[in-house]
Amino acid sequence: MGAGNFLTALEVPVAALAGAASDRRASCERVSPPPPLPHFRLPPLPRSRLPGPVSRPEPGAPLLGCWLQWGAPSPGPLCLLFRLCSCTCFAPLPAGADMDPNPRAALERQQLRLRERQKFFEDILQPETEFVFPLSHLHLESQRPPIGSISSMEVNVDTLEQVELIDLGDPDAADVFLPCEDPPPTPQSSGMDNHLEELSLPVPTSDRTTSRTSSSSSSDSSTNLHSPNPSDDGADTPLAQSDEEEERGDGGAEPGACS
C-alpha cells in the first residue's frame, strides 16, 4: 500500500466522524424547548428542602429538584428515587464510625437500653396486681379457733360512747355489752375433753370397797362349805387368797399393833 493511499484512508473516517458530530449537535439544538416566558417560571425550592448545595444545573447532569425549572429535562422516577436514596440512605459515614473499638461494651449498652425501655412499658401498660396470700396461709386460717375478744380495729366509737353512758353496776345493762354465756367449744378443745374422759378412771369410794369385801367374804365362806373334806382326799388343797382380803388383813392388824 502506498503512502498516498494510506493518507486518503485516514481522511475519510475523520471527515465521517466530524459530520456525525455536527449532525448530533444540530439534532440537540432542534430538540431543546424554547425558553419559557417569565410569568410561567415556577418558584425555586427553599434551601432546607434541597438535599445538597444549591447550584446552577448543568445541561448534561440534572440534579434533584432542577427538573421543576423550565428548560431542564425531567429525570424519570427511577432516577429520582436513586438520587434521593443516595442523598439520604447511602451517605458516606465518617472514618472509624463502623469500626467500634469495643463491640462488647456497645452490645451491653444496647441491651441495657432495651431492658429499660421494656421495663418502662411494662410499668405503664400492665395493671397493678394485688398481693395474694399463699394457700398455706388459708389452711392455717381455717384451723385457728375463733377470737373471743374484740380487736382494736373493730371497736366502734359509738359503741364506746354507749358503754360510758351505761351504768355497769346494773346487771341487765351490763349483759348487753358483757354477755355471760360460755363461748362455744372449739373442735380442738372438745377433742381434748374427750381424751381426758377416756384417760380418767373411776375411783371406788369407801362404801363400795366395804360392800365388795363383804360380798367376797360371803362367797369365800360358801365355797368353803361346798368344798370337799381335806381328809377325803388325803391332801390339803390350798385356797387362793384374794388381794382384797390381804388388804383387809393388813388393815385389821395395824390397829391391834397400835393398841
UniProtKB/Swiss-Prot annotation:
> Is Aminoacyl-tRNA synthetase one of the keywords?
no
> What tissues harbor this protein?
Detected in brain.
Residues with Phosphoserine modification: S217, S218, S242
Superkingdom as given in the UniProt entry? Eukaryota
List the GO molecular function terms. Answer: ATPase binding
Keywords in UniProt for this one? Phosphoprotein
Q: Tell whether Nucleotide-binding is among the UniProt keywords.
A: no
- Where is there biased composition of kind Pro residues? 32-46
Mark out the compositionally biased spans (Low complexity).
Answer: 205-223
Biological processes annotated in GO: apoptotic process; ERK1 and ERK2 cascade; monoatomic ion homeostasis; negative regulation of protein kinase activity; neuron projection development; regulation of signal transduction
* Entry-annotated residues carrying Phosphothreonine: T237
Q: Which InterPro entries match?
A: Dysbindin
Q: Which GO terms describe its cellular component?
A: endoplasmic reticulum; lysosome
Stretches for region Disordered? 27-56, 174-259
Q: How does it assemble?
A: Monomer. Interacts with CSNK1D and CSNK1E.
What this chain does, per the entry, is described as: May modulate the activity of casein kinase-1. Inhibits CSNK1D autophosphorylation (in vitro).
Q: Which family does it belong to?
A: Belongs to the dysbindin family.
Q: What is this protein called?
A: Dysbindin domain-containing protein 2
Q: Which organism is it from?
A: Homo sapiens
